[in-house]
Amino acid sequence: MAATCEISNIFSNYFSAMYSSEDSTLASVPPAATFGADDLVLTLSNPQMSLEGTEKASWLGEQPQFWSKTQVLDWISYQVEKNKYDASAIDFSRCDMDGATLCNCALEELRLVFGPLGDQLHAQLRDLTSSSSDELSWIIELLEKDGMAFQEALDPGPFDQGSPFAQELLDDGQQASPYHPGSCGAGAPSPGSSDVSTAGTGASRSSHSSDSGGSDVDLDPTDGKLFPSDGFRDCKKGDPKHGKRKRGRPRKLSKEYWDCLEGKKSKHAPRGTHLWEFIRDILIHPELNEGLMKWENRHEGVFKFLRSEAVAQLWGQKKKNSNMTYEKLSRAMRYYYKREILERVDGRRLVYKFGKNSSGWKEEEVLQSRN
């Protein structure tokens, strides 16, 4: 009697929202306390009762194999009402099972317990398990895509798809500088040439105002020579306008100037160079610097960009990227913070420092390489 009352109570929890198109007549059942066990069959056979008080079915939103015994009974009651089936033909003593047991029942077993309704139950179970599996796969795929998109958002800069630095940073080969005499041969490994996968995703630290940069930099006329006249015709010594460049696209440097900066490469030299080596080689060759950068403290490895956009343009020419800007270049430089090749000098705009894992910039190293 108690088991029958429990089943009667379960049958009161119908829900038709998921099947509203075909279950508009699905009725709720009054609480078990309002009728006795003898009223169970009558209740199941009377679908014309009020829809008021309909509750969400407990089995919705879960995969059938994870249903509890209560959820299984709830689902069976729903199918009875949906198919207008005579509940008196069901052997309820054999309905005491959880979802895993129900899913393992063969078609013949369901027919034995539920009669003709067994075919419908078997088909519905198959559809539910199939749709659950498809939905789970879809959710996993969506999460994987979202995870990758989120990671890209957290890790801007050189790893952005289409980034001008991606190929340079992901090069497997060890790339030596074509400017540095000590690295033009078969080439000792460069500190910046190891596989980028070892650097992790911590390369992209939050941008500092000193990194966001800009092309407008006050240039002290005593800070060195300016660009050659063929590269920047209006920047002549003594010109009162040369101290501060106007806003706008940087002037295009001549092919002769770029050829001079790049120098003659050995046919065995690796293609390209790393960004930090490119910066280093500008600094250690004053004859090629032409006012692009200067040492702030040579002993400590501290340097400053004087013509930030011009340096970015040179790097863009080397990488065949006409859209290069200092903002993009400074983002790529942050990749080297994690590897301690470059460091940011806090509180100083356009000022950076070579880290402990950099090489080839110290005076003794330069002198040794030239001997």
From Swiss-Prot:
Induction: Transcriptionally regulated by ERBB2 receptor signaling in breast cancer epithelial cells. Up-regulated by phorbol 12-myristate 13-acetate (PMA) in bronchial epithelial cells. By retinoic acid in MCF-7 mammary epithelial cells (at protein level). Residues 273-355 bind DNA. It is found in: Cytoplasm; Nucleus. GO terms for biological process: blastocyst development; cell differentiation; extracellular matrix organization; inflammatory response; mammary gland involution; negative regulation of DNA-templated transcription; positive regulation of transcription by RNA polymerase II; regulation of transcription by RNA polymerase II. The keyword Ribosomal protein does not apply. InterPro entries: Elf-3_PNT, Ets_dom, ETS_fam, Pointed_dom, SAM/pointed_sf, WH-like_DNA-bd_sf, WH_DNA-bd_sf. Residues 242-251 have a biased composition (Basic residues). GO terms for cellular component: chromatin; cytosol; Golgi apparatus; nucleoplasm; nucleus. Changing residue 319 to A: Partially abrogates repressive effect on the KRT4 promoter. One of its GO terms (molecular function) is DNA-binding transcription activator activity, RNA polymerase II-specific. Its main location: cytoplasm. Residues 46-132 form the PNT domain. Transmembrane segments: none annotated. A motif (9aaTAD) lies at residues 137-145. Belongs to the ETS family. Interacts with TBP. Interacts with CREBBP and EP300; these act as transcriptional coactivators of ELF3 and positively modulate its function. Interacts with XRCC5/KU86 and XRCC6/KU70; these inhibit the ability of ELF3 to bind DNA and negatively modulate its transcriptional activity. Associated with CLND7 and POU2F3. Interacts with ZNF768. PANTHER family: ETS, ETS-RELATED TRANSCRIPTION FACTOR ELF-3. Transcriptional activator that binds and transactivates ETS sequences containing the consensus nucleotide core sequence GGA[AT]. Acts synergistically with POU2F3 to transactivate the SPRR2A promoter and with RUNX1 to transactivate the ANGPT1 promoter. Also transactivates collagenase, CCL20, CLND7, FLG, KRT8, NOS2, PTGS2, SPRR2B, TGFBR2 and TGM3 promoters. Represses KRT4 promoter activity. Involved in mediating vascular inflammation. May play an important role in epithelial cell differentiation and tumorigenesis. May be a critical downstream effector of the ERBB2 signaling pathway. This is ETS-related transcription factor Elf-3. It comes from Homo sapiens. The lineage of its organism: Eukaryota, Metazoa, Chordata, Craniata, Vertebrata.
